[in-house]
Amino acid sequence: MNLHEYQAKDLLESYGLKVQKGIVAHNPNEAAQAFDQLGGKFAVIKAQVHAGGRGKAGGVKVVKSSQEAREVAESLIGKNLVTFQTDAEGQPVNSVGIFEDVYPVTRELYLGAVVDRSSRKVTFMASTEGGVDIEEVAHNSPEKILKVEVDPLVGLQPFQAREVAFKLGLEGKQINDFVKTMLGAYKAFIECDFALFEINPLAVRENGEIVCVDGKINLDSNALYRHPKLLALRDKSQENAKELKASEHELNYVALEGNIGCMVNGAGLAMATMDIIQLYGGKPANFLDVGGGATKERVIEAFKLILDDENVKAVLINIFGGIVRCDMIAEAIIEAVKEVNVTVPVVVRLEGNNAEKGAKILADSGLKLIPADGLADAADKVVKSLG
């Protein structure tokens, strides 16, 4: 689950980090009032969407008066912002953040952390190249990114943060401020179950103060049951409508750009299914895992979800029966096909628990379903069904 910038800054500030002060506004009048309340000569207005690249897309503007703040807010709120991280429709802008002017600054740094699956540790990354796309820095100048792996038994140690501060070229009070920032960020990461966080840029002001000018936080969705207050910050308007609907039925769904819909039980099998579709010349329209303990109702909802996509021209159902029984899946498929007006070819591959019984149920249904014997046969048939 992603947080908006203003939410991320509020959370980081509660852990002792110095952040760029700001006020969220949901309409132009609130934006004008926020400018006056901040009291500076300048302010920065940022569209609050769950996507990067806002500046290049026109979602970040510097304003010099309350009237200008009102006009910029009016041009953003209620519109969709399209960035390189969104689809063609973009993300809806329901609010803007009006932030204090912290410039001029002497330096812009980068600080971030992720759960590194290879090392199975929280890994911090820092760089002197803040304020730019960190992916570009990683690609073009990987030596400019410092990495610190944190031992989960002892947590991030002050000496590790000091070492990073020295390598970033900080000096004097800046070193202590950076150590506090990094330790506070780690504490927030662990206590709030972050999956990822970024401060880009982490600015060094002319007076030596270190300030978080931006904030990006992604929370581990599997841990949200432990954080009801954070869950309350969820903005469903920023989520893909199909993925949101899928989550409500405990389905793991990711929309893709192909034309072959996939319904599979198990994430690994789902990945393999997409790979073999690609191998046979097709393009998957989605990743959809109905789970190891799929119910009839969940399978029906999954089928509806796939067919809601106008780009889907064929469907491949690939089920390996373990906990879930193939005969139950077969009954759910029949019910779903009858309930939804299916006009595209549907290829079904069943293996495992009650697979033969499931295949017989499908064969006796009278529906125009295409049976497949094995994964390769299923991929071949679904690609050929497109003509």
Curated annotation (Swiss-Prot):
SUPFAM superfamilies: Glutathione synthetase ATP-binding domain-like, Succinyl-CoA synthetase domains. Its cofactor is Mg(2+). Its EC number is 6.2.1.5. The keyword ATP-binding applies. The keyword Ligase applies. Keywords: ATP-binding, Ligase, Magnesium, Metal-binding, Nucleotide-binding, Tricarboxylic acid cycle. Residues 9-245 form the ATP-grasp domain. InterPro entries: ATP-grasp, ATP-grasp_succ-CoA_synth-type, ATP_grasp_subdomain_1, Succ-CoA_synthase_bsu_CS, SUCC_ACL_C, Succ_CoA_ligase-like_bsu, Succinyl-CoA_synth-like. This is Succinate--CoA ligase [ADP-forming] subunit beta. It comes from Francisella tularensis subsp. holarctica (strain OSU18). The gene is sucC.
